[in-house]
């Protein structure tokens, strides 16, 4: 017997934007191919890449205490430019390409490298924003923090238009 819909449970704080978008796209492609409605149920968290995947749902449901949102992009690292010198190690790096060692944690940060990284982040962030707007459309509240990287409870997420209702997969 054919099921009228597919239910997906999400419990993810995020991860790679590439992998999140690929999962989103595969779900949407299968939904179109099989002519199935997709219902997404957020458990503890659907934040950042987890929320990007949740966008594959035709409807998104969350527990009142679930965490949803975090529509932003983060990159992190460490800097150790003085550490090797202190312990008497000489680091040798040879590259072909003037930018091959960009953001090397053993070299001081350079402003042009930081600007480049931020430009990539802004581009990826815009892809995420566009996905949210395309999938949630007129359901979204007009809130300046919506795309700031903040995250909210399921209850607040519903008020913001990030989720459609408060329920879990076992609700009737």
Task: List where the protein language model places each region.
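Small-residue-centered hinge/linker elements
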Residues: 1-36, 45-52, 57-135
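Glycine-rich beta-to-alpha transition loops that act as phosphate-gripper elements at the mouths
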Residues: 40-47, 146-150
């Amino acid at each position: 017997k054919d099921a009228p819909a597919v239910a997906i449970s999400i419990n993810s704080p995020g991860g790679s934007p590439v992998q999140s978008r690929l999962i989103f796209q595969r779900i949407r492609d299968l939904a179109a191919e099989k002519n199935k409605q997709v219902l997404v149920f957020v458990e503890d968290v659907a934040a950042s890449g987890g929320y990007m995947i949740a966008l594959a749902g035709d409807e998104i449901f969350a527990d009142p205490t679930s965490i949803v949102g975090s529509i932003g992009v983060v990159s992190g690292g460490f800097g150790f430019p003085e550490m090797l010198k202190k312990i008497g190690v000489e680091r040798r790096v040879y590259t072909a390409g003037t930018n091959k060692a960009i953001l090397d944690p053993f070299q001081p940060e350079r402003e042009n490298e930081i600007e480049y990284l931020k430009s990539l982040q802004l581009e990826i962030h815009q892809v995420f924003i566009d996905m949210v707007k395309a999938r949630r459309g007129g359901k979204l509240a007009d809130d300046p923090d919506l795309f700031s990287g903040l995250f909210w409870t399921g209850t607040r997420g519903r008020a913001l238009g990030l989720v459609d209702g408060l329920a879990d997969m076992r609700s009737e």
